Regions:
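Carbohydrate-associated surface elements
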Residues: 11
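Charged, low-complexity assembly regions of eukaryotic complex subunits
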Residues: 16-219
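Internal amphipathic alpha-helices that form coiled-coils
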Residues: 1-4
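Intrinsic disorder/low-complexity signal
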Residues: 6-7, 219
Length: 219
């Protein structure tokens, strides 16, 4: 094998050891709709077309099932021998271009693990938000964007609680009043203080916040 082929082989073997991440050969760039049939444990790097496929599987701890897989095809640039993203199914909210620029040709393992981590954190965020809804009475998740970065819960007392979340934390919380339910400024600030921070203890945060979110006026 040439030096480059040995490097490629080592790179692929390293990737396949990462949990939830699989490197595989890509013989057809239109693989995405048939990717499950293209995975192989041998000849993972397609030297002829300079293509490397990466599959990322995230696991839902609540349902005990893997989610629909995500895929990235990397292609090597003949001019500078560097990889670039040729095809992918990664959602926009993962900010793949940012990660590509920062890590791809400096540390491939780091690039892939960062993508996987972000996908896993969004799934974890979804699970925690759903757990709030199923664990606590009188609260319902009524609105959420695809990345669960902005979510709104309806309380049975007429108030709403809107959360802004990043990959690991509740960045902000806002109490939304209605004509029939009001809350003092001091209580709103206290709720905000309770809710901000890591979302890994979101159920506990909500339990504390609900004690505060008893309307000063309701009909």
């Amino acid at each position: 094998k040439t030096e480059q082929e040995l490097i490629d082989s080592t790179m692929v073997e390293s990737l396949t050891r990462l949990f939830g991440i699989t490197a595989f050969a890509v013989s057809d760039p239109s693989f995405i709709s048939h990717a499950q049939n293209n995975a192989s444990s041998e000849g993972l790097y397609n030297d002829e077309h300079h293509l490397l496929g990466i599959r990322l599987d995230t696991y839902n701890e609540t349902t005990k099932q893997f989610q629909a897989p995500y895929y990235i095809i990397l292609k090597r640039n003949d001019k500078n021998d560097e990889f670039f993203i040729f095809k992918h199914t990664i959602p926009k909210y993962i900010h793949l271009t940012e990660l590509e620029s920062r890590y791809l040709n400096l540390d491939l393992n780091k690039f892939v693990s960062e993508v996987y981590t972000r996908l896993s954190l969004v799934l974890r965020k979804k699970i925690m938000l759903e757990k709030v809804e199923t664990s606590l009475k009188g609260i319902e998740l009524i609105d959420a964007d695809l990345s669960f970065s902005k979510v709104t819960f309806q309380l049975s007392n007429g108030l709403k609680l809107q959360l802004l979340l990043d990959f690991t934390e509740v960045a902000n919380a806002c109490v939304l009043e209605s004509a029939n339910a009001r809350l003092s400024t001091d209580k709103k600030l206290l709720v905000q203080s309770i809710m901000k921070g890591s979302y890994f203890t979101l159920v506990d945060k909500f339990q504390s916040a609900l004690e505060v979110m008893k309307p000063d006026y309701s009909m």
